[in-house]
Amino acid sequence: MIQKAFKMKLFEGKEEEYKKRHNEIWPDLVKELKSHGTSKYLIFYDKDTNILFSYIEMENEELWDEIAETDACKKWWAFMKDIMETNPDNSPISVELSNVFNLK
């Protein structure tokens, strides 16, 4: 299993809206995530910095990368762009984080 972590940034005061939207996540997006090998996806929020921390477990990085080309993902990005920092294509500005410790 491949593990990845990313950070993204939420706009000030948008935590509740972010939670609401994810509590109502679209079934077609969930289906795409799972069909592209995502087995676990957790998102945490740091209220002091508005940083979102995402942890993902996936079967295959190439499959994961293909999610960005799906209609469901592109629509979700457009839906979320008003509450978080995004790139010109509406994808979240995200920075991959390095794993520095793993207790086994």
UniProtKB/Swiss-Prot annotation:
InterPro entries: Dimeric_a/b-barrel, L-rhamnose_mutarotase, Rham/fucose_mutarotase. GO terms for cellular component: cytoplasm. GO terms for biological process: rhamnose catabolic process. Its EC number is 5.1.3.32. The keyword Thylakoid does not apply. Substrate binds at Y18, Y41, W76, W77. Keywords: Carbohydrate metabolism, Cytoplasm, Isomerase, Rhamnose metabolism. The active site is at H22 (proton donor). Its main location: cytoplasm. Pathway: Carbohydrate metabolism; L-rhamnose metabolism. It catalyses: alpha-L-rhamnose = beta-L-rhamnose. GO terms for molecular function: L-rhamnose mutarotase activity. It is found in: Cytoplasm. It is an enzyme of class 5 (isomerase). It holds the Pfam family rhaM. It comes from the Bacteria. Involved in the anomeric conversion of L-rhamnose. Belongs to the rhamnose mutarotase family. Homodimer. HAMAP family: L_rham_rotase. This is L-rhamnose mutarotase. It comes from Clostridium beijerinckii (strain ATCC 51743 / NCIMB 8052) (Clostridium acetobutylicum).
